[in-house]
Amino acid sequence: MQVILLEKVVNLGNLGEIVRVRDGYARNFLIPQKKARRATDAALKEFEARRAELEKIQAEKLAAAEALGGRLAGYQLKIVQKAGVDGRLFGSVTNADVAEGLKKAGFEAVEKAQVRLPNGPLKAVGEYPIQVALHADVTVDVTVVVEGDIA
């Protein structure tokens, strides 16, 4: 299926590009999330009429993400979790826990899907570098300090 991208999509293309994707990807992800439309003649005409508006919205989103990234860059998040005497956690710290901690710290715009844990969930006490992808072009490094609450 050919679609017109309504915003930048990682590993696919930029705003306004017409790309060919699998039908399921278009129907189940891109179109419901308003990231793309089917590439019909009517949709192309409507897109060209709204192109300036969509580019302005994209620029505003990018500026907001860069502003948040400037505040978030180098931030150190402390998470306390129950742990055994050897430093292993009972359970783990997931991207949802990190996103919740960042929201409590005043970064409300961070969603769990934006948090990237390079080695999977954190299962031991220590400091871990993680990345937060605020926008397709804005990725920020954050340090998560996991402290153990001896059970």
UniProtKB/Swiss-Prot annotation:
Residue ranges of the TM segments: none
UniProt entry keywords in alphabetical sequence: Ribonucleoprotein, Ribosomal protein, RNA-binding, rRNA-binding
GO-annotated molecular function: rRNA binding; structural constituent of ribosome
One Gene Ontology cellular component annotation held by this UniProt entry: ribonucleoprotein complex
GO biological process: translation
Family of this protein: Belongs to the bacterial ribosomal protein bL9 family.
Function: Binds to the 23S rRNA.
Name of the molecule in the record: Large ribosomal subunit protein bL9
Native species: Bordetella petrii (strain ATCC BAA-461 / DSM 12804 / CCUG 43448)
